[in-house]
């Protein structure tokens, strides 16, 4: 925030918004003025509330009120003034809110006021508009701001934002600054202020005398003075004001200074201009001086004459007004005519002289903007050598911060300061080069420093007597050297040495007192001037007190007051003196001495000095190593070469640091020690933490990283002016972070140095090719030589040309060099085609590529076009300032021209592009230009919202001009002209006409503010009205029509249309179709027309019109306004007796009796017809009118049909009559009789009586104590709130009492009724009352679930009380008492006893929570336990018994019973029969008893008990809990040897050997018996116990029968023994022996061995590398997956290897075997013949099989061998040879010739004439290959 800047708080903003919303313009401005806004102070005066209005404010107010030239009459002008003022104030408040409380700047205020003026219909020649846009062109923001009283500070603040580097290139802001400071010595006083007063006088005449004086001489006089004012005073004043200011602007010496500044900067930057160019510069500057002098002379003369003429005119007008007041009409007329002539002559005289000056200025300065732009562009080709320091500061800041944090001290400076103005010692922050620089440490380098403010001073002593304070040694602080050679601890210690008499005071008694000075640095530059050094006597200082206190007070700005004392003045008063710790910024530094450079040295590349380093040129002049390295770097021709030298260059510059090599090596430490002269040390907590971590050691990796960074740390110290002797860390992570910050900072530094030297080194030869040329009488830069230079380099080194051009465009600010961008595009395309693009991009680096992928303009006139970088063809172009040309190219592009006259170019294939053209400036001319043969007839022009859409008719592209039609195309977003390739031009007016033309499709048509007729035509169209009175015709199609602010007519026509009226008194006609009409504001007329329409009138007095065939229409008439009168009007002869009036809910339904239509008036009856939705009157074609009261009576009349009748709030009797009726009560006490039919009756809030009558009725009591009588039929009664009486009557009724104490009444023949009595309230008493002689002994009481069933013993009826027993009868559903006709009463406790009594039938008995014994007796009973410990006896029958939460005992007794234990430790005994027992949770005991039982223990440690005759039982023992122990217990003398234990799958089978029973433990062996289904122990009656391990052993023992034996996961050996056995392997390596019998053996996942033994066996290998041996018999072997070995053994075997590399082994006597070797893998299979030589085996083809025959008895058939490789065996191995598949393949592939011949492999030739392979020739016996029989 700038000092003194006003910023509103959120609360103040809210208060301001309140003024805006109330329209209190004056109050709002005054509120802002009181907060310090000086613009608001003047604005408050201008809006006319302040009494003392004078001067400039009067001029502004009267000008705004009276100078409109398009309005007549004072009242109209004042109203318009008020509207302008209010809109401007509201926009001003909105800007403050958007700016987070900051006041708007001048540009924002200008735009706000301009918009307020134009939005309220004021033409561009209005007074304020003149001030902004005519009188002061190009300077409107500055002069206008001053004119309206904006303080100079805010103008300056805006300059600082717009020119952060202090650039003076914007001439408008130069003139503002010059004006504010008093341009031309006393410009404001001499010219501007004076001219304001003259203008005020003229205005005053036009106002006061027009109103007062001229009225006395009649209407003709008033007309003449108006004509005089408009034709002479106003127009001519405007002209001279414009000329004067234009000449002032063009004659401003700043133009000349700017030229000289540019030339100086260019030369200073090291650019060598030739003699010709220097001559041109000199000629131009000389011409400028000559013409400038002429301009000044002529302009001054013009100003003087103009001012004189205006003053004379003003005096004459005053005199004329006086004469006219009392003179005759004839005399008055003559005076006015003379006055007009005199004014004209005076003006012409002044104008002639002024125009001569203007013409001279225009002639010279016509070319100056382009020439100035030329110089700026050339200078912008290279960075400013000084400018890199700001970048360097940013990149080095992290290192400075890190060293401050790690080295235990902060660099501060420590001088004594005095408070000279009594407000405390004040300091300022470091400000880089813009602030104070001082040599504190006496090393010859001035560095940026915190400083004492100008109103306080530093205590100093000029030790060397040169009149200047040279360095910190001449201050009093820690750089003061004491007599003993040490440095002072602080300022007070330094001053104490001057206390020669030891009295602890420095005064005249001390010898050095007279040598002391106070330095008051008035200009804050850190350099002492003579007028800034004052003696103590001059300042009235008598003595300096050496006593002080340590305060360590934070002064802000990075500065601290460390010690504070005082000094005494000669008047006896005291003031503060303190020792400061000033912030240090060593980056911004300047050496006090300059190095004189030779001409050659001055040509070297340069960067400004930084830290402890001189300017690069100066440093190189002092260092031969650096000079040589800089020369080598400058001569390097490629980026790679420069980067290879960059590190060395950076180091060589760093080595010129005066401290280089003089300080001790940097070390890292966790042990901090306080030392003197260390500045501000670590905090105590940081010290404590360091001491805690003193033992932290670093890993070798961390140490290596730190060692590698040491050199870079030294470099960074030189560049930053830091000293990193010791860096502290608290952990290894801290240490590694130091390395990271070091490397990151160094890399950023290297990047900045590279970029800032680029144009002074490698790219300089290209810049030398840029020349100048004259075009249209002005200088421009000529880049043609530059293009040639790049192409020349490209011929020999394409990569260099590519990289150099890319970096020139990226860093040279040459985006306006169109040829260069086009050249880059060509280079990119060529690189892509050559496959080099990615390589080139890697050389460039990500940052450069990103800059080229982004396209953004400058303040100049740029040509912007994507050059092919980036991954997306869709680009965004930003023109910013200047007259820019934006070319998007292919892809979907975003183009934003910014300010200036911009041109958007679109050629063939332009894509889906968007143009954002916001530019509020006047005089700009923005153009869209279509090229490549595109003409207007190839495009369509449509509008969508405020956007203009230009679409190619062939669908190839679209340009969207955003907000084009804002302000009807006159706003800031417009495109002024659209140009086509055939020369045709469309202006805004033509475009506006085009977009209002309809098509046969779906159009969007918009009216303009003046009012239009729009016709949608065919298609589903959108029509939008504006502020005029529009006629909007939708025509055919489903149209959407939106009115504007006028009185519009909307006609939907055919189709289902939507019409919206908005403001104004609109007429809406839906036409045909189902339409939606909404009148919104105004007194509207809505005609739905044919179809089913929805009509909303909105606010205002609306009329809904319905004629014949109006359809099924709906009216929504919400309008809460008072005084409105809404009407429904029936036309076309429709009368009231042709309609019916009924009510449905709050809706009124008006139906045609002939069924032709209906009007539903929604919510008509809200508030009994007095609400916001009512229709006030219904009018008919015969003149009859129905008001609301009449309608209310009509809708309560019943018919013989199904009626809906509603009571009103006062209470009514409604009779439904015949039909199924709906009756609704209200707030009164209503009597609602349903009568005949199935009626629905709803009570209201009163005590109502509801009588259903005949039929199945529904009665709802709602609030109140209601009486509900269902009558005949099956009725539903709901009492809801209140103490209600419910009588179901005849039929099967459902009764709900609701809340309150309710009574249910049942008499004879009450039917099958249900009571739902939910009511949780305390204190209620609900009763069932039996009448008509019914007593308790005539009824039975039973329970079903939680329901109570009360049944008539004669079967005539039943009452079910739902959920009665919830919470054991104490819940919300209970009936508190049951009353009988004999006076007997049953309470809840009695009822609970009754329902637990059993019968001989099938009972449902329920225990209560306290615990019960229930006996089912005879019948199939259901017994239910509860939370107590229950005894539940099923007794006889098939019973279902359910335990509760207690420890319950369940006895099934006789029959097939189901027992469920639920929670608790339960005992379940099934008894006789086939029972199902489920213990569920708890440690349960389950006894199945006799019969075949199914037992589930559930969770917990359960025991299953089996005695004699236990039957065929099954145990399901799933329980995954840890710690449980489940047991099977055999009783009745049963021991283990009486049983067998076998396994079937995962089940354990325990069988009685005598066949009397079996227990199947399901899934016992899951996870090898460790799973959730296991039984932990089996107990026998003799005490023996079997654990799981024992059982597992038992089931693996074989018998002489057919066994099923299973291996375990760890690996097992299984022996089948006798019998046909099934053996199953598992995941381990198993040995499975089938032994005798026809066995089936299944391997598992391990490497298993399967031996079939005797018999015809089946062996299956599964996964793993298995060995299968069939043994004797005809066996089937299948290896499946893995590398298996298959041995068929004796017999005729079938062998399948499966996948993997399998081996088939055949020995002597192997029989007639078949091998099926199909596989899809690439493994190798082998057939091994043991005991056979190759000559013993014949190879025979048999169809597709290969037969290997050793004898008639022994042969192997390889099935499908000749089908292909997937069926073959790869290698045949014999005792003496091996034949591989490749050896054999050529003979297989030889085909029939080989098959039909005999080849002797041992001979040298064969029938085919070919030779055989050597390994096959080694076979001595012929191998026959013959066709099969």
UniProtKB/Swiss-Prot annotation:
Its membrane topology: Peripheral membrane protein
A molecular function (GO) term: toxin activity
Entry keyword annotation includes Repeat: yes
Hemolysin-type calcium-binding repeat segments: 869-886, 887-904, 1015-1032, 1033-1050, 1051-1068, 1069-1086, 1087-1104, 1215-1232, 1233-1250, 1251-1268, 1269-1286, 1287-1304, 1415-1432, 1433-1450, 1451-1468, 1469-1486, 1487-1504, 1615-1632, 1633-1650, 1651-1668, 1669-1686, 1687-1704
Subcellular location(s) of the protein: Cell outer membrane; Secreted
Record keywords: Calcium, Cell outer membrane, Membrane, Repeat, Secreted, Toxin, Virulence
Chief place of localization: membrane
Spans annotated as Disordered: 1671-1690
GO CC terms, sorted: cell outer membrane; extracellular region
UniProt cross-references to Pfam families, sorted A to Z: HCBP_related (PF06594), HemolysinCabind (PF00353)
Source superkingdom: Bacteria
Database matches in InterPro entries: Haemolys_ca-bd (IPR010566), Hemolysin-typ_Ca-bd_CS (IPR018511), Hemolysn_Ca-bd (IPR001343), RTX_toxin/Mannuronan_C5-epim (IPR050557), RTX_toxin_determinant-A (IPR003995), Serralysin-like_metalloprot_C (IPR011049)
Role this protein plays: May participate in the pathogenesis of meningococcal disease.
Family the UniProt entry places it in: Belongs to the RTX prokaryotic toxin (TC 1.C.11) family.
Domain notes: The Gly-rich region is probably involved in binding calcium, which is required for target cell-binding or cytolytic activity.
PANTHER family assigned: S-LAYER PROTEIN
Name this protein carries in UniProt: Iron-regulated protein FrpC
Species of origin: Neisseria meningitidis serogroup B (strain ATCC BAA-335 / MC58)
Gene that encodes it: frpC
């Amino acid at each position: 925030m700038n000092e003194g800047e006003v910023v509103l708080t959120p609360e103040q903003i809210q208060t301001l918004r309140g003024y805006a919303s109330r329209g209190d313009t004056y109050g709002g401005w005054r509120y802002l003025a009181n907060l310090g806004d000086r613009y608001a102070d003047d604005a408050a005066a201008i809006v006319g509330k302040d009494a003392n209005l004078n001067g400039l404010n009067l001029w502004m107010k009267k000008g705004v009120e009276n100078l409109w030239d398009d309005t007549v009459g004072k009242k109209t002008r004042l109203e318009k003034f008020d509207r302008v003022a209010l809109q401007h104030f509201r926009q001003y408040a909105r800007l403050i809110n958007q700016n987070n409380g900051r006041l708007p700047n001048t540009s924002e205020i200008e735009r706000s006021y301009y918009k307020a003026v134009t939005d309220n219909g004021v033409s561009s020649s209005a007074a304020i508009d003149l001030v902004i846009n005519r009188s002061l062109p190009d300077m409107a923001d500055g002069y206008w701001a001053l004119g309206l009283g904006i303080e100079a500070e805010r103008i300056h603040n805006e300059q600082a934002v717009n020119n952060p580097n202090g650039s003076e290139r914007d001439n408008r802001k130069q003139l503002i600054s010059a004006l504010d400071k008093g341009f031309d010595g006393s410009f404001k006083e001499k010219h501007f202020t004076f001219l304001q007063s003259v203008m005020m006088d003229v205005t005053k005449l036009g106002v006061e005398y027009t109103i007062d004086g001229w009225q006395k001489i009649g209407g003709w006089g008033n007309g003449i003075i108006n004509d005089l004012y408009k034709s002479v005073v106003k127009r001519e004043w405007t002209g001279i004001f414009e000329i004067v200011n234009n000449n002032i602007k063009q004659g401003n010496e700043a133009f000349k200074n700017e030229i000289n500044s540019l030339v100086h900067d260019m030369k200073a930057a090291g650019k060598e201009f030739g003699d010709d160019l220097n001559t041109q510069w000199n000629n131009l500057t000389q011409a400028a001086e000559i013409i400038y002098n002429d301009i000044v002379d002529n302009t001054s003369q013009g100003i003087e004459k103009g001012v004189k003429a205006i003053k004379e005119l003003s005096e004459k007008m005053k005199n004329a007004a006086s004469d006219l007041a009392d003179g005759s009409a004839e005399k008055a007329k003559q005076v006015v005519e003379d006055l007009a002539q005199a004014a004209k002559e005076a003006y012409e005289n002044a104008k002639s002289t002024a125009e001569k000056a203007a013409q001279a200025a225009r002639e010279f300065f016509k070319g100056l903007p382009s020439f100035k732009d030329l110089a700026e562009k050339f200078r912008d080709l290279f960075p400013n050598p000084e400018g890199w320091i700001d970048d360097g500061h940013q990149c080095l800041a992290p290192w400075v911060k890190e060293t401050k944090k790690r080295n235990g001290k902060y660099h501060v400076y420590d001088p004594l300061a005095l408070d000279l103005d009594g407000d405390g010692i004040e300091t300022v922050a470091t400000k880089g080069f813009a602030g104070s620089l001082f040599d504190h440490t006496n090393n010859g380098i001035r560095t940026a420093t915190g400083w004492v403010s100008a109103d306080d001073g530093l205590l100093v002593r000029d030790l060397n007597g040169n009149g200047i304070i040279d360095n910190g040694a001449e201050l009093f602080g820690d750089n003061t050297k004491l007599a003993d050679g040490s440095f002072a601890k602080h300022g007070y210690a330094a001053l104490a040495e001057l206390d020669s008499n030891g009295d602890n005071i420095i005064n005249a008694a001390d010898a050095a007192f007279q040598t002391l000075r106070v330095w008051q640095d008035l200009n804050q530059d850190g350099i002492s001037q003579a007028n800034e050094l004052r003696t103590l006597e001059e300042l009235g200082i008598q003595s300096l007190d050496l006593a002080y206190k340590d305060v360590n007070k934070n002064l802000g700005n990075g500065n601290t007051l460390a010690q504070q004392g005082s000094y005494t003045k000669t008047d006896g008063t005291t003031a503060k003196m303190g020792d400061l710790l000033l912030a240090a910024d060593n980056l911004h530094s300047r050496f006090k001495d300059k190095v004189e450079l030779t001409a050659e040295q001055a040509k070297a590349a340069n960067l400004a000095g930084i830290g402890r380093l001189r300017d690069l040129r100066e440093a190189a002049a002092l260092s031969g190593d650096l000079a040589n390295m800089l020369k080598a770097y400058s001569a390097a021709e490629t980026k790679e070469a420069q980067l290879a030298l960059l590190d060395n260059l950076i180091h060589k510059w760093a080595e010129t640091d005066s401290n280089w090599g003089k300080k001790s090596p940097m070390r890292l430490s966790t042990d901090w020690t306080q030392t003197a002269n260390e500045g501000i040390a670590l905090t105590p907590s940081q010290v404590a933490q360091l001491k805690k971590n003193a033992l932290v050691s670093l890993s070798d990796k961390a140490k290596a990283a730190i060692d590698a960074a040491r050199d870079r740390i030294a470099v960074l110290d030189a560049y930053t002016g830091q000293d990193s002797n010791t860096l502290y860390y608290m952990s290894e992570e801290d240490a590694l972070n130091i390395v990271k910050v070091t490397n990151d900072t160094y890399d950023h530094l290297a990047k900045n140095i590279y970029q800032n030297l680029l144009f002074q080194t490698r790219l300089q030869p290209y810049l030398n090719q840029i020349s100048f040329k004259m075009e249209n009488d002005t200088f421009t830069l000529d880049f043609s030589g530059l293009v040639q230079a790049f192409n020349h380099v490209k011929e020999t080194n394409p990569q260099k040309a590519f990289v150099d051009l890319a970096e020139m465009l990226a860093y040279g600010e040459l985006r306006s060099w169109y040829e260069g961008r086009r050249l880059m595009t060509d280079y990119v395309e060529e690189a892509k085609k050559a496959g080099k693009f990615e390589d080139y991009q890697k050389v460039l680096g990500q940052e450069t590529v990103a800059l080229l992928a982004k396209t953004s303009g400058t303040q100049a006139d740029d040509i912007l076009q994507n050059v092919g970088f980036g991954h997306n063809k869709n680009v965004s172009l930003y023109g910013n300032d200047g007259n820019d040309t934006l070319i998007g190219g292919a892809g979907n592009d975003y183009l934003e021209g910014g300010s200036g006259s911009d041109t958007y170019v679109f050629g063939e294939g332009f894509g889906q592009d968007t143009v954002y053209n916001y530019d509020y400036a006047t005089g700009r001319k923005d153009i869209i230009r279509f090229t490549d043969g595109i003409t207007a007839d190839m495009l369509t022009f449509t509008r969508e919202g405020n956007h203009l859409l230009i679409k190619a008719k062939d669908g190839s592209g679209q340009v969207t001009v955003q907000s084009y039609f804002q302000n009807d195309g006159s706003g800031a977003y417009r495109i002024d002209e659209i140009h086509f390739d055939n020369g045709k031009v469309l202006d805004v007016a033509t475009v506006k006409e085009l977009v209002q033309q309809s098509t046969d499709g779906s159009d969007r048509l918009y009216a303009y503010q003046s009012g239009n007729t729009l016709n949608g035509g065919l298609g589903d169209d959108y029509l939008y009205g504006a502020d005029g009175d529009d006629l909007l015709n939708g025509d055919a199609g489903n149209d959407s029509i939106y009115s504007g602010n006028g009185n519009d007519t909307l006609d939907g026509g055919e189709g289902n249309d939507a019409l919206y009226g908005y403001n104004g008194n609109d007429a809406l006609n839906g036409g045909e179709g189902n339409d939606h009409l909404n009148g919104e504001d105004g007194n509207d007329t809505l005609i739905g027309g044919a179809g089913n329409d929805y009509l909303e009138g909105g606010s205002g007095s609306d009329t809904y019109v319905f004629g014949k065939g109006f359809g099924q229409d709906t009216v929504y008439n919400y309008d809460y306004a008072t005084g409105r009168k809404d009407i429904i009007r029936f036309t076309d002869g429709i009368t009231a007796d042709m309609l019916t009036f009924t009510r449905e809910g709050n809706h009124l339904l008006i139906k045609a009796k002939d069924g032709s239509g209906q009007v539903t008036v929604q919510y008509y009856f809200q508030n009994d017809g007095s609400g916001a939705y009512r229709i006030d009157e219904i009018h008919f074609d015969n003149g009859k009118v129905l008001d609301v009261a009449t309608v209310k009576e009509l809708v309560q009349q019943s018919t013989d049909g199904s009626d809906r009748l509603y009571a009103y709030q006062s209470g009514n009797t409604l009779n439904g009559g015949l039909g199924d009726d709906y009756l609704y009560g209200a707030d009164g006490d209503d009597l609602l009789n349903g009568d005949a039919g199935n009626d629905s009756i709803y009570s209201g809030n009163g005590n109502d009586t509801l009588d259903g009558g005949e039929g199945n009725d529904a009665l709802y009591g709602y609030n109140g104590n209601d009486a509900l009588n269902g009558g005949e039929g099956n009725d539903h009664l709901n009492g809801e709130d209140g103490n209600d009486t419910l009588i179901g009557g005849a039929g099967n009724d459902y009764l709900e009492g609701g809340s309150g104490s309710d009574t249910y009444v049942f008499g004879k023949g009450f039917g099958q009724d249900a009571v739902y009595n939910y009511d949780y309230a305390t204190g209620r008493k609900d009763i069932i009352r039996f009448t008509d002689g019914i007593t308790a002994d005539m009824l039975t009481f039973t329970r079903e679930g939680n329901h109570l069933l009360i049944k008539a013993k004669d079967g005539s009826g039943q009452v079910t009380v739902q959920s009665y027993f919830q919470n054991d009868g104490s819940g919300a559903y209970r009936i508190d008492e049951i009353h009988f006709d004999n006076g007997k009463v049953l309470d809840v406790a009695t009822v609970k006893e009754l329902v637990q009594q059993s019968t001989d039938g099938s009972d449902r008995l329920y225990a209560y929570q306290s615990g019960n014994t229930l006996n089912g007796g005879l019948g199939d009973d259901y017994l239910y336990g509860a939370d107590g410990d229950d005894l539940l006896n099923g007794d006889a029958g098939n019973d279902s018994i359910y335990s509760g939460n207690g420890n319950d005992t369940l006895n099934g007794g006789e029959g097939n019973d189901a027992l469920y234990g639920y929670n608790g430790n339960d005992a379940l005994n099934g008894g006789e029969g086939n029972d199902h027992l489920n213990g569920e949770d708890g440690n349960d005991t389950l006894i199945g008893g006799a019969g075949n039982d199914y037992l589930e223990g559930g969770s917990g440690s359960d025991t299953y008990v089996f005695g004699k005759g236990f039957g065929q039982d099954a145990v399901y023992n799933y329980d995954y809990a840890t710690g449980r122990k489940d047991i099977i217990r055999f009783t009745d003398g049963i021991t283990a040897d009486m049983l067998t234990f076998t396994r079937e799958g995962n089940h354990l089978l325990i069988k009685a050997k005598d066949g009397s029973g079996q227990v199947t433990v399901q899934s016992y062996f899951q996870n090898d018996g460790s799973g959730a289904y296991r039984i932990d122990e089996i107990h026998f009656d003799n005490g023996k116990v079997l654990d799981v391990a024992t059982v597992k052993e038992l089931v693996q023992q074989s018998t002489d029968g057919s066994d099923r034996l299973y291996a375990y996961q760890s690996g097992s050996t299984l022996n089948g023994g006798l019998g046909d056995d099934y053996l199953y392997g598992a995941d381990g390596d198993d040995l499975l022996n089938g032994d005798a019998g026809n066995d089936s053996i299944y391997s598992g996942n391990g490497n298993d061995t399967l031996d079939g033994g005797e018999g015809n066996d089946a062996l299956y290998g599964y996964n793993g590398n298995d060995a299968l041996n069939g043994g004797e018999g005809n066996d089937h072997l299948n290896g499946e997956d893995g590398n298996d070995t298959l041995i068929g053994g004796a017999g005729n075997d079938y062998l399948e290897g499966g996948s993997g590399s399998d081996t088939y082994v055949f020995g002597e006597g192997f029989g007639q075997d078949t091998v099926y070797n199909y596989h899809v893998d690439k493994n190798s299979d082998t057939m091994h013949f043991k005991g056979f030589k190759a000559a013993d085996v014949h190879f025979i083809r048999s169809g597709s099989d290969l037969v290997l025959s050793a004898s008639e008895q022994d042969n192997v058939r390889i099935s499908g061998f000749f089908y292909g490789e997937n069926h073959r065996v790869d290698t045949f191995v014999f005792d003496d040879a091996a034949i591989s598949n490749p050896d054999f393949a050529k003979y297989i592939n030889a085909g029939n010739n080989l098959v039909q011949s005999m080849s002797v492999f041992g001979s040298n030739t064969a029938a085919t004439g070919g030779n055989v392979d050597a390994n096959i020739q080694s076979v001595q016996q012929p191998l026959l290959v013959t066709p099969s029989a």
